Amino acid sequence: MTADPTLNLAAAAACFLGIHIFISGTRLRDGLVRMIGEGPYMGLFSLLSLGAIVWLAMAFNRASEETFTFLWAPAPWWHHFAMTAILVAAILVVLGNVTKSPTAAGGESALEGSDGNDDGREAGDAARGILRITRHPFLWGVLLWALAHVAMNGDLSSLIFFGAFAVLAFIGPMLIDAKRARKLGDRWDAFAARTSNLPFGAILTGRNKLRLGEIGILWPLVGVGLYLALAFGHEWLFGVSALPVR
């Protein structure tokens, strides 16, 4: 571990991004899977990723305590926009985790039976629910969460820490799409033709339709509950209040 807290944080961020972009996000992953199998690869990569996240979190805490450097002073009204963005992020993260999707790890079975029809009603058609809006709801949630924290905090440590998550969430959809295209071929092409990475892109271009009934109300409410729990428990969990100072 490097002695300088900021350099240590930067190294942790580089490690976190590196293993996702240059291992998981490239053909190197394909070769490793062929060598050791999908299950062992996923297990080893999960451990490596967890280790990188733990290092990143510890480095962030240390840098925040020892070398706190303001880059800009957030305006008071930024807080309201950031909290709204995080509310949307919480809902997207929940929906991304509960929706069966071919973009999720091990989610290729979601395309079984897909026949390429774009009306979203055929058996096995995965382009439904939140996936009509974006095929990467979880990563869009992470991106909103990360950017909101960067803007709201305004310090160097937050820029590096949350910026690492923002970079991965921005690049991640392209890496995942490329992996799925290589592995699933025509089945992926049919799904991608009915969906979009950019929210509402497929709907605005007439390739899909917005059907909020497929999303329902339960899981968005769970997202709101997650948001409220984190907002009111932020100080207890992380030592910093997320609520506006009166």
Residue ranges of each PLM-predicted region?
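Helix-boundary and loop/linker segments of multi-pass membrane transporters
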Residues: 1-3, 34-35, 73-74, 117-121, ...
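Membrane-interface helix termini and inter-helical loops of multi-pass transporters
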Residues: 29-32, 62-75, 236-245
